[in-house]
């Protein structure tokens, strides 16, 4: 459900800027964050606590192999984990508002204050990792979205002859052409903040939980976390 909060925040320019920056007191107290959390919380409560879990591994298994979960909020990866009997019935989709969440972290970076020799080696490594050769393997073997946009994903998918890989190519195309692409907020706000939001949403899934009161409690938790 934190992905829903993430996507709703990204649906406005102000909210997107907040998600792409460190969490601040202004963000915690903003209308954008309140709206995103409460909207997700109401959806969770309507869905019911019996359909809520923080065990992502089990949730993925229920979706990929058993077909007991209707929607999985996940990145464009793990196509190989989908059971062959379910591949034809699974379709990729973006969040409402044509929003895509980039689940990658900070990417590749070169440290400051290194010697020219080390800096040159580091840049060579980045050049290699982002090369078409390596990026094709990231798509076909790692089954993730390559950062090199020159890679022809559809051609690779067709060559593979694998339906799941073809669905992966479709998912990557949707993400790459989304109207709004935003970073996963746990990389900017921190995993501890993400966990606090998830816990609050799980509590809100219980029938009768006062969402407004739980949000006020969450605000206090987050302000304490960011000090």
Which ranges hold each PLM region?
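Extracytoplasmic/periplasmic solute-binding protein
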Residues: 1-25, 69
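Glycine-centered hinge/linker elements that transmit conformational signals in sensory
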Residues: 22-53
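Short helix-initiation/N-cap motifs at beta->coil->alpha
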Residues: 50-65
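Beta->alpha turn/N-cap motifs
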Residues: 56, 73-80
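Pocket-flanking alpha-helical
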Residues: 61, 78-85, 223
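Alpha-to-beta junction loops
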Residues: 65-74
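Extracytoplasmic/periplasmic substrate-recognition and gating elements
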Residues: 84-145
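C-terminal capping/gating helix-and-loop segments adjacent to ligand/active sites or protein-protein/ligand interfaces
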Residues: 102, 166-221
